[in-house]
Structures are given as structure tokens and as C-alpha cells.
From Swiss-Prot:
The family this protein is said to belong to: Belongs to the universal ribosomal protein uL24 family.
One Pfam short name: ribosomal_L24
GO biological process: translation
Self-association and partners: Part of the 50S ribosomal subunit.
GO CC annotation terms, alphabetical: ribonucleoprotein complex; ribosome
Organism taxonomic ancestry: Bacteria, Pseudomonadati, Spirochaetota, Spirochaetia, Spirochaetales
Protein name: Large ribosomal subunit protein uL24
This protein's UniProt keywords: Ribonucleoprotein, Ribosomal protein, RNA-binding, rRNA-binding
InterPro entries: KOW, Rib_uL2_dom2, Ribosomal_uL24, Ribosomal_uL24_CS, Ribosomal_uL24_KOW, Translation_prot_SH3-like_sf
Organism, scientific name: Borrelia garinii subsp. bavariensis (strain ATCC BAA-2496 / DSM 23469 / PBi)
């Protein structure tokens, strides 16, 4: 699936346990159609001890969210993204109100 989202974009989560939360995209996996949003969809991960002297630990980590479950969020407005050309330059804009990004 082709996406117009980029790393660092502010997005709103549309479904799941963090529905309605807003965060920035930390990474995008285009092959699996997943995004990781900072401080959202946190899961606990168990890290095993590597040596007998070292202890195992439990850490909180962001889990991937399907790209269809997020939408771009700018200045209180969430909308789909569009692309148009102005002066031979690709411009991303909000389809709801035409605002440039």
C-alpha cells in the first residue's frame, strides 16, 4: 500500500486501545504497512539475562500499528492527504481544507 505519511508527521490513532491519542511517527515499515508512533501502543517486552550474573528485565516498548489506523493531524484538523504539483515541486496538502504541509 502506498502511503503519503513521513517520519515526524503528527498523527491521530483511529482505533485500538490508544484511540484518539496523538503522537509523532517514529518509523514506517512500508512492506508490512505498519507505523510506530512515539509513546503510543506501549507493550511490555521481557529481556532475558545473557549471563548468569546479569538479571533479566521488563521494558516498555512501542508496538507497530497498521497504517490504516492512523490519520495525519495538523493544528486541530485530521484529514486525508493529497499530493499536487506546484512549480514542478511535489506538495502535500490536507484534502479537507487544502492547507499545505
Amino acid at each position: 500500500m502506498k502511503t503519503k505519511l513521513k517520519i515526524g508527521d503528527s498523527v491521530k490513532i483511529l482505533s485500538g486501545k490508544d484511540k484518539g491519542r496523538i503522537g509523532k511517527i517514529a518509523s514506517i515499515n512500508r512492506k508490512k504497512n505498519k507505523v510506530i508512533v512515539e509513546s503510543c501502543n506501549m507493550v511490555k517486552k521481557v529481556i532475558k539475562a545473557r549471563t548468569p550474573q546479569e538479571k533479566g528485565k521488563i521494558i516498555d516498548k512501542e508496538a507497530a500499528i497498521d497504517i490504516s489506523n492512523v490519520i495525519i493531524f495538523i493544528k486541530g484538523t485530521s484529514s486525508r492527504l493529497g499530493i499536487r504539483f506546484e512549480n514542478n515541486e511535489k506538495i502535500r496538502y490536507l484534502k479537507k481544507n487544502g492547507q499545505r504541509i
